[in-house]
């Protein structure tokens, strides 16, 4: 691990880990996060649009869906729908700009980071409803499914996988692939790594997820496949690119999904990196391992999606996309190509 990586793990162990042993205080966590958030500069040649109101939210009593666009000047040949982490109860597109900027610029993709509704005010399935509505809005605005990738980290990674399952079950066109960073896929917390890596994980104690899960679940079962996609039938999903650290308490949430997806015939590139912390790609401005992870992620995104530069169309202020071309036949080759360079 790099010196920067060791310093980040030291900081997490000293400042973040102790808080996970305390009772969950939603208001305090949100306030501290808002106070400490670091906003990276917008990359040269790109624009940040803090908007994309989606008319027709799933629940008319709630405000319309919103989020942030990071858009390449002149348009981009592909689109990423990004779902941020934060245990379903805190964080936002702003807290995840570093990972969104890094992935978008490397993948040459316009990226929409969804500001989905948070628990406990909006329990399951609110976040899933919002993710589905945002994906369908992207399609309605002209982004071909073959040029779309859904990505997410931690809770957002689990939400991304659940979104794929729900789209398949509903008969919607599926995206070209998905990128999942340290996804939280088992809200029942049955993975052996929850206990085996307790004390090794620099960020989380082992029992914190069992305390967070009820905030999101409400009255739903922890094994509902749309809340915990580890328990879903994974057949027919597009290629998956997954990363997790070897000392994560959530490690088995990645490993078991990779195993079950492969058994269901899904192409999976799964990298388990030694000692790296939860969702380390978010540290790309500071950490070389994070930059390499984003490079690999972007390569996957490019390989599974349409890349017809002649078909680019600049996005409007409301996020409307122009047409692209079909790259469905590239999907399986792309995931297999990525898998050869990333250990599983």
Where are these predicted regions, by residue range?
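A glycine/proline-hinged amphipathic helix-loop "lid/cap" segment
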Residues: 1-72, 306-312
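Alpha/beta-hydrolase superfamily serine-hydrolase fold, recognizing
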Residues: 55-70, 74-313, 322, 330, ...
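Residue-identity detector for glycine
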Residues: 319-324, 334
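A short, well-structured alpha-helix characteristic of acyl/acetyltransferase catalytic modules
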Residues: 9, 332-333
């Amino acid at each position: 691990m790099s010196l920067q990586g060791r310093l980040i793990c030291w900081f997490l162990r000293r400042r973040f880990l102790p808080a996970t042993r305390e009772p969950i205080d939603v208001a305090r966590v949100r306030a501290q996060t808002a106070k400490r958030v670091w906003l990276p500069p917008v990359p040269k040649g790109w624009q940040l649009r803090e908007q994309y109101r989606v008319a027709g939210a799933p629940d008319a009593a709630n405000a319309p869906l919103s989020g942030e666009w990071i858009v390449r000047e002149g348009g981009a040949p592909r689109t990423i729908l990004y779902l941020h982490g934060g245990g379903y109860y805190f964080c936002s597109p702003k807290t995840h700009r570093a990972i969104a900027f890094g992935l978008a610029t490397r993948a040459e993709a316009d990226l929409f980071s969804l500001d989905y509704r948070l628990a406990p005010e909006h329990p399951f399935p609110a976040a899933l409803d919002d993710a589905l509505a945002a994906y369908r809005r992207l399609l309605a605005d002209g982004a071909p499914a073959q040029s779309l990738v859904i990505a997410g980290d931690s809770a957002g990674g689990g939400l991304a996988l659940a979104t794929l399952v729900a789209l398949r079950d509903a008969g919607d066109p599926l995206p070209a692939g998905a990128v999942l960073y340290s996804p939280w896929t088992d809200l029942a917390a049955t993975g052996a790594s929850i206990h085996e890596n307790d004390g090794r994980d620099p960020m989380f104690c082992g029992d914190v997820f069992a305390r967070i899960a009820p905030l999101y679940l409400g009255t739903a079962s922890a094994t509902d496949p749309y809340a915990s996609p580890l328990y879903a039938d994974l057949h027919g999903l597009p290629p998956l690119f997954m990363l997790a650290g070897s000392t994560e308490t959530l490690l088995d949430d990645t490993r078991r999904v990779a195993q079950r997806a492969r058994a269901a015939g899904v192409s999976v590139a799964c990298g388990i990196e030694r000692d790296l912390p939860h969702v380390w790609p978010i540290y790309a401005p500071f950490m070389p391992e994070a930059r390499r992870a984003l490079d690999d992620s972007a390569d996957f995104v490019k390989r599974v999606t349409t890349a017809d530069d002649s078909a680019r169309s600049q996005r409007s202020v409301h996020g409307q996309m122009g047409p692209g071309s079909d790259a469905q036949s590239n999907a399986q080759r792309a995931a297999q190509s990525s898998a050869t360079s990333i250990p599983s």
